């Protein structure tokens, strides 16, 4: 930690599902909370209780029974700017308790995002929060930093978007980036659907959060899907029980691995797309023939949706099947990969060589929001 917390840079990783925020130089984010804004569904009757017209993050999560929950970031793209401002305000003033006008701020975004998205981010940071300087970094690149590499292919899968980003000697190769709008939130929705087939009905935005918890606690990736299905059909060894908030206990069996299997077979949710193993392979094949070997040997996983037990072994198996037989394939799954984007941001923002990369308030005033495309790439 820097001695003077007065001028330390802030790092804010705005995920579709979780906001990770903290100070550059720390080894973990100080604040991790859901990217949710909740609004009451009912009329307040108790006068003087100080009810608010909206709740953010954990508070929205704890009062979810009476709220309608909305995620302002969908598939990595900010779709509701008013709610996003609320989330940033909450991050700075309630979670980190800092004055944003005193700290340079590093934000993150998904690769291949619309240009307007980062322009608007830049504009809000400078005009609403008056930050002295800011920067927008690509999430997958930060994950590679966090793993201590400069070359590799990152599979970054969060709540809203999954992407493969090949990076060679610190340069992302934009022509080979693959983006797949299938991630944690879609898996939660799919789990809601297949639990309905078992007779458990989850419909509201609050119940979706329960299903997300079931997914995080009980789901895993099968090494061989067909075999696992056969095992599940013939015995109850794979069944697990889960206690709902009201004390009712439900049992789930093959749903545990059918849910994340969607990552490898997107047709499960009606998506016409290759699975994550194929997009990884396709991305490597779009790179120059001389660097493929280095990419195969450095497959870095990052993001919350890569946290399923068994996912690294399955990726190893699938990519080995696609790649040339002599190729050495290595999947790197760091235990802290849930936060590796944030950790990479923390490393980047505290490098002395990075200090001239910030977009200053002065540069913004001279050039306007489009400065972000020139300074951040």
Swiss-Prot record:
Q: Which residues carry this modification: N6-methyllysine?
A: 86
**Which positions hold the covalent cross-link Isoglutamyl lysine isopeptide (Glu-Lys) (interchain with K-52)?**
272
Q: Which residues carry this modification: Tele-methylhistidine?
A: 75
Cysteine disulfide links: none
**Cellular compartment(s):** Cytoplasm, Cytoskeleton
Residues modified to N-acetylcysteine = 2
Top-level division of the source organism's lineage: Eukaryota
Query: What's a GO biological-process term for it?
Result: response to ethanol
In the record, the note on similarity to other proteins reads: Belongs to the actin family.
Please give the function described in this protein's UniProt entry: Actins are highly conserved proteins that are involved in various types of cell motility and are ubiquitously expressed in all eukaryotic cells.
Please report the name of this protein according to its UniProt entry.
Actin, alpha cardiac muscle 1
Q: Specify the species.
A: Homo sapiens
